């Protein structure tokens, strides 16, 4: 079996959707035909997504705070946690803290 060819075919057949949708069978699905109601998301997949989300938070904070990389690790982690929980708009509400 050629995994790459099969993946290309399934992606062509299913398409890619960034946000959840109802498939033709009525199930909540996302990505490339992932049935969220019967398959869900594996823990390893959730960890992979979390890592990507954290990297996005760090990128955003580096734009917001020019000295982000110079801050102590614990402060960086608190800021990333805040950015993750509050979203990009929410953390920008802390104007005095962000200076």
Task: State what each model feature region is.
Residues 1-78, 84-85, 89-96:
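Acidic, aromatic-lined catalytic clefts of primarily extracellular/periplasmic carbohydrate-active enzymes
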